[in-house]
Each structure stands twice: as structure tokens, then as C-alpha cells.
């Protein structure tokens, strides 16, 4: 007859296999975009924020510096030959096709200033400007004067040049040196690391020469350098943490074999959490994996407690079950947060905890061959007599910290670039005078309608002398082209014969006759390359406005977006939402613990995690850090760990002290090491997590372990 435990084990393995199969079917690549974890793609504005951020994040700039322009041109040629072998391409559309259209239909393309002269029928001033341009020996012509006597096409192209984009040329002189800026675009993120290594080798090769220097700017290079350094640091931390756990196992159990079942329980919990999240949501965010590391600490906690209880013949199933249920219910509450990242963390952690719990009570008993015969005995100081002093210090520090508390939702404060990268960005701003950027998104039923809206906005910006970059500048709407042709028709009727003395009568007559035609260019039918540079989707375009500019009064389906400001506003609202969720989590803890134990004991168990969370925020504020969304998220991790400590200390007493200490010290070492990483986001989280765990553990000792 099959034992009841074996039946449960069979069901567990069968469920794991089914979960794996469904996960493989549903699996999509891990989401790495930070914003997509917080923003809702169903919200139109937030969807546009994600897309615009992705566009900005794919832009890479190469700045070449030299005293001689010839050296710069040679370096550019070498760079372009190198880029042909990569998926980093020059961010420039095919201008030859546009110039061909402009030259063929010059009457369709008229700059804002000349349109104003035509509208006001100020033909005298228009004639004067055109003649000055015509007889300028340095002038070039897009179309010859016999076909475009007022040089509309030439003037139109000249007005397309933008100092902030490489429309035609972007070389400047600064402090006695020449600087050329090449705009590049990442076309395939999968090969980005390989391609950037090629680009960095080119930079290093050029920088070895005396007469040339290359700088790299833009999000991709910052991400590459920071992620590589952070990965190296985190790998070192993982190795140290791994070795510390092995050392603890050897020291306490006098055996390394015990490490095998512990490692299996951790792995099982992490895998179950991952598979469940994939089955339910189809995809996982990289930040979910980071924040769900609480499973590792809890897995250690459960495993150590179970193994030590078996060796000491103590029954801790109730404590394990209560710990699992309270934590699972609390994390499931995150499903109602409305934030994608919190939903994923809730599902991952809750399902992973259930997986760890089932593995510990069903599978660990089968691995007794790996158990040691004896355990050590950890002597802990009796700090219960200092409980009042400890609480007083915590309260004072918390009060002072909260009095000085400052919040920050500016995503730019989460990252401090390395010195060389910072110098490159400063040089870029000094030489090329990079202004603030605002995006304007326009949604419409057709490309032509979208362009018409852009033209209305563009007229307002032109009137105020504001530089911008838009689809309508390159491809005017059919309506605007018809208006231009009508104004040129009136111009030729009233002014051509007096103005164009450099043309014979036959040419003038031909020009006048040609102006009667209604030749309008419909760019939507040609699938022009320019469209893809300005369209978020088939019904949405975006304009780029340069410099500080007051918000415009715009119509429906038009949004003004400043990436950093808009994202910061959303981060602020999410941070506030996180804070509002926390009291409900503590309430859930209290209700569940009151059911399992008495209300007074429930309060006592909750008090350590609650006080530790408050102290962690207060201490972080006291040392000068501004509280951001990631500090608040760290509180969820602190709760996951510290609640376990309290439950086991409250019910296991001295028998649980060793397991709790081993679990605590292993996790504390890992988070303390994180505090020394170079990436500010990770280091600030490491500080608050280490402080929160230490405080919670000390409070647990003071509240529950009165005698050694």
C-alpha cells in the first residue's frame, strides 16, 4: 500500500511537470525595459512613454575630436566601414529621394517665413530675399532658377537643417578644435553587446593617437558599461555569499553534504515561482527576478529549520505552515495594486513560497542521507535586558530620520555615470549645446490628418521661434501643398514678370502655365523612409521640440511628453500606491496570525517587522538618501524575511535560534555586499535591506529569546 506522503510526492512531481509544459508553451523573452515594469501599456499615454523611451534608449552618439578636419573625415570613413559589419547604423534617412521630390515640385515646398510673406502678399520683400539668395556666390541650388525662380526648394532645404540632428552635416569648431557628431541607432538589441565592443575597440584605437580623440555618449553605452560592471560585482557577491553559506554549513553541521538539500530547496522554489509567473502572465520582468530573491532567504530559513528540527526531534510544521500562509496571502494582495511589476512579484513570491514549503515537508525527508549526525550550538548574547534601550534608540533614530525625510521620484537620480562617460556627456552639451527635449505625440485616422495637425502645431512653434523636428517639416500634407501652389500661382500672376528679369519670356510663360497644375505628392502611398522615423505606430506620430517651452494648448489625441518629468510623475503615483498598500499587508498579517495564535501574540510577532521597516526608512533618510520607489519596494523584501524570523522565534524559542541566525547571517552578508556596488540603485537597496534585516533580527532576539 502506497503511503500518504508518497501520494503527495507523486502529485507534486506531476504538478511540476504540467507547470513546466504550460510554461514552455507560454514562454516569452524576459522583459528588460525598466519602464515596462511600472507603466501600463493599455494606457495610451504610458504606452507612448514606453515607445519614446525605447527610441531614446536606442540612440548612440560618436563624437570625434581633432585639430584637423581631415583627420575627422578619415576617422569617420573608418567608423562607417566598421559599422557595416554591425547592427549599429547611421541614424539618417535617405535624403536623396527627398531632394529629388523637392526639386521636381518646388512650388509644393515652402518654408514658414516665405509662406508668411506669400500670405501677406508681401511680394516686394520676397523678391528682394530671393534675389539676394540667387546672386550669392556661395549659394547652392536644389533646383535651377529657370524652374524655381524664387528658390523655394533651396530655401526649404536650408530651413530643414537642425543644429541638434545630423540632417546634412554636424561638424563644429570649439576651443580651437573640430568636433564631428555622428548619430547612430541600435537596430538589433540582441547583438548590442558584441557591436558595442567593436565600437569601443575603435574608440580605444583612435585614442592612442595624439591628434584624435573619440567620445561615446547615449543610453546604450551607459547601459553597456554599467551592466558589465554591475554583473561582475554581483557575480563576486554571489560567490562570496555561496562560500559563506558553505562555511556556515561546515562550521555548524560539520558537513558540506547538508548544502545539497538546501540548494535543491532554493532551486525548486525559484523554478516554481518562475514557471507559475510564466504560465499566468506569459512573460517576466527582470526586476521581478531581482525582488523575488527573498525566496532564497526564506528557502534557507525553511530548510535550516526543518533539518535542525529533525535532528533535535522538534515539530515545527505549524510554524512553517503559518509562516507560509501569512506571507503568501500578503504577497497575493499585490495582485490588486494595478502595477505590473507588483503583480509579478506577488505571483512569483507566493507560488515560489508554496513550492519551497512543499519541497521541505515532502522531499527533504527523503534526503536524510545528507543530514549531519550532530549540530553545533551558537551562543548568542542575551540582549533582552537591553530591549528598552534598543527600542528607544530605534524610535529616536526613526523620528529624526522621518523629520528629515525627503522623497525623490526623478529617475535620473538612480544612476551616477562613470567619470569618462560623464565627461563625454558634458563635452556633448558644451560643444553641441544640447537643449531640453519635449515630445508631442499626435494620433489621427490617417498619416495625412496627422501631418495636418503637426503643421498647425509647427506654425505656433515657428511663430515663437522654437526649434522642432517633425514629419510635417519633410512631408507637408496635401492640404498644405495645395495652399502653397495656390499662393505661388497668385505670385506668378502678379509678380513673376517684373521679378524674373534673368529669364526669357517663354520660360516665364511656361512657369506660369505649370503653376496652374495641381501636382500634390501623397507620401503615404510611397511608403517613404521618412515615415518610419517619426511614427510610433500607423496612427501616431511624434514631434521633437527643443529647449524650455511652455505647454501648448493642444487638441484631443495630442500629448505633450517630457520623458523624465512624465515618468517621474508616474513613479510618484506608484510610490504613493505602494505606501498605501503596506498598511493592508500588515492588517492581513494581523488577522491571519490572530487566527493561528492569540491577538496579543500576533501583535508581538508583527511588531519586529513593522518597527524594522520604519527604522530602515528613517535610517536611510538620516544618512542623507532620498526615499524613492525602490526603497519602498525593499520594504516588501524586509517583510518577507523578518516575518519568518519573528514566527519561528516566537514559537521555537531557543530551539529556533540557530536556524534563524544561520538564515539571517547568510542573507545579511549578501545584502551588505550589495551596498558596496557601484550602481547607485543596487547599492541604495542593499543599504536599506541590510539595515532592515539587522534591526528585525535584533528585535526578534530582544522580544522572544529572553534566556540563553
Feature locations, PLM:
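A short beta-strand structural signal in non-transmembrane regions
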Residues: 60-65, 131, 135, 139, ...
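Solvent-exposed soluble domains appended to multi-pass membrane proteins
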Residues: 510-560, 564-570, 580, 584-587, ...
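Solvent-exposed, non-transmembrane loop/terminal regulatory segments of multi-pass membrane proteins
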Residues: 24-67, 164-167, 404-443, 640
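Solvent-exposed, non-transmembrane alpha-helical starts
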Residues: 68-76, 189-197, 447-454
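Juxtamembrane segments of multi-pass membrane proteins
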Residues: 48, 391-504
Amino acid at each position: 500500500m502506497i503511503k500518504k506522503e508518497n501520494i503527495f510526492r507523486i502529485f507534486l512531481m506531476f504538478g511540476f511537470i504540467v507547470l513546466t509544459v504550460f510554461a514552455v508553451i507560454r514562454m516569452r523573452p524576459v522583459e528588460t525595459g525598466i519602464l515596462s515594469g511600472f507603466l501600463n501599456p493599455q494606457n495610451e499615454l504610458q504606452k507612448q512613454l514606453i515607445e519614446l523611451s525605447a527610441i531614446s534608449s536606442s540612440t548612440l552618439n560618436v563624437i570625434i575630436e581633432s585639430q584637423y578636419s581631415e583627420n575627422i573625415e578619415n576617422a569617420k570613413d573608418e567608423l562607417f566601414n566598421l559599422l557595416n559589419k554591425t547592427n549599429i547604423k547611421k541614424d539618417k534617412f535617405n535624403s536623396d529621394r527627398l531632394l529629388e521630390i523637392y526639386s521636381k515640385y518646388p512650388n509644393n515646398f515652402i518654408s514658414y517665413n516665405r509662406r508668411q510673406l506669400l500670405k501677406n502678399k508681401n511680394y516686394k520683400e520676397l523678391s528682394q530675399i530671393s534675389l539676394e539668395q540667387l546672386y550669392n556666390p556661395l549659394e547652392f541650388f536644389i533646383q535651377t532658377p529657370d524652374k524655381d525662380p524664387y528658390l523655394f526648394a533651396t530655401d526649404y532645404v536650408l530651413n530643414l537643417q537642425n543644429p541638434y540632428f545630423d540632417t546634412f552635416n554636424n561638424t563644429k569648431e570649439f576651443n580651437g578644435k573640430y568636433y564631428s557628431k555622428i548619430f547612430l541607432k541600435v537596430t538589433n538589441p540582441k547583438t548590442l553587446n558584441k557591436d558595442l565592443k567593436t565600437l569601443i575597440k575603435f574608440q580605444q584605437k583612435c585614442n592612442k593617437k595624439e591628434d584624435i580623440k573619440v567620445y561615446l555618449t547615449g543610453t546604450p553605452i551607459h547601459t553597456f558599461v554599467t551592466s558589465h560592471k554591475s554583473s561582475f560585482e554581483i557575480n563576486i557577491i554571489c560567490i562570496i555569499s555561496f562560500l559563506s553559506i558553505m562555511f556556515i554549513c561546515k562550521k555548524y553541521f560539520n558537513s558540506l553534504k547538508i548544502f545539497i538539500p538546501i540548494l535543491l530547496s532554493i532551486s525548486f522554489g525559484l523554478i516554481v515561482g518562475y514557471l507559475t509567473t510564466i504560465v499566468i502572465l506569459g512573460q517576466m520582468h527582470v526586476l521581478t527576478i531581482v525582488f523575488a530573491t527573498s525566496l532564497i532567504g526564506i528557502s534557507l530559513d525553511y530548510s535550516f529549520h526543518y533539518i535542525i528540527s529533525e535532528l533535535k526531534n522538534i515539530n515545527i510544521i505549524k510554524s512553517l505552515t503559518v509562516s507560509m500562509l501569512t506571507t503568501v496571502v500578503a504577497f497575493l494582495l499585490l495582485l490588486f495594486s494595478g502595477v505590473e511589476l507588483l503583480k509579478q512579484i506577488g505571483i512569483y513570491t507566493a507560488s515560489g513560497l508554496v513550492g519551497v514549503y512543499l519541497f521541505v515537508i515532502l522531499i527533504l525527508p527523503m534526503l536524510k542521507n545528507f543530514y549531519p549526525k550532530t549540530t553545533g550550538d551558537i551562543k548568542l548574547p542575551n540582549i533582552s535586558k537591553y530591549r528598552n534601550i534598543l527600542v528607544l534608540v530605534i524610535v529616536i533614530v526613526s523620528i529624526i530620520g522621518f523629520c528629515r525625510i525627503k522623497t525623490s521620484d526623478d529617475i535620473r537620480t538612480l544612476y551616477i555615470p562613470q567619470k569618462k562617460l560623464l565627461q563625454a556627456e558634458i563635452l556633448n552639451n558644451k560643444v553641441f549645446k544640447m537643449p531640453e527635449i519635449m515630445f508631442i505625440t499626435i494620433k489621427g485616422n490617417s498619416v495625412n490628418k496627422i501631418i495636418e495637425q503637426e503643421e498647425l502645431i509647427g506654425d505656433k512653434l515657428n511663430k515663437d521661434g522654437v526649434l522642432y523636428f517633425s514629419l510635417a517639416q519633410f512631408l507637408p500634407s496635401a492640404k498644405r501643398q495645395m495652399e502653397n501652389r495656390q499662393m505661388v500661382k497668385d505670385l506668378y500672376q502678379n509678380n513673376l514678370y517684373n521679378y524674373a528679369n534673368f529669364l526669357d519670356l517663354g520660360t516665364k510663360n511656361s512657369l506660369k502655365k505649370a503653376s496652374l497644375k495641381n501636382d500634390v505628392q501623397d507620401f503615404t502611398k510611397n511608403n517613404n523612409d521618412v515615415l518610419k522615423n517619426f511614427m510610433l505606430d500607423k496612427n501616431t506620430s511624434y514631434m521633437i521640440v527643443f529647449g524650455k517651452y511652455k505647454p501648448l494648448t493642444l487638441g484631443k489625441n495630442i500629448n505633450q511628453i517630457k520623458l523624465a518629468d512624465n515618468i517621474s510623475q508616474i513613479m510618484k503615483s506608484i510610490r504613493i500606491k505602494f505606501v498605501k498598500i503596506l498598511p493592508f499587508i500588515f492588517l492581513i498579517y494581523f488577522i491571519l496570525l490572530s487566527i493561528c495564535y492569540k491577538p496579543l501574540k500576533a501583535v508581538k510577532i508583527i511588531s519586529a517587522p513593522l518597527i524594522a521597516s520604519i527604522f530602515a526608512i528613517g535610517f536611510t533618510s538620516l544618512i542623507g538618501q532620498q526615499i524613492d520607489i525602490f526603497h519602498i519596494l525593499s520594504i516588501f523584501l524586509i517583510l518577507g524575511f523578518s516575518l519568518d524570523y519573528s514566527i519561528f522565534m516566537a514559537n521555537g524559542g531557543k530551539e529556533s535560534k540557530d536556524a534563524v541566525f544561520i538564515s539571517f547571517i547568510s542573507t545579511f552578508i549578501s545584502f551588505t555586499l550589495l551596498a558596496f556596488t557601484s550602481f547607485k540603485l543596487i547599492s541604495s537597496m542593499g543599504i536599506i535591506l541590510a539595515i532592515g534585516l539587522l534591526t528585525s533580527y535584533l528585535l526578534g532576539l530582544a522580544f522572544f529569546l529572553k534566556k540563553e
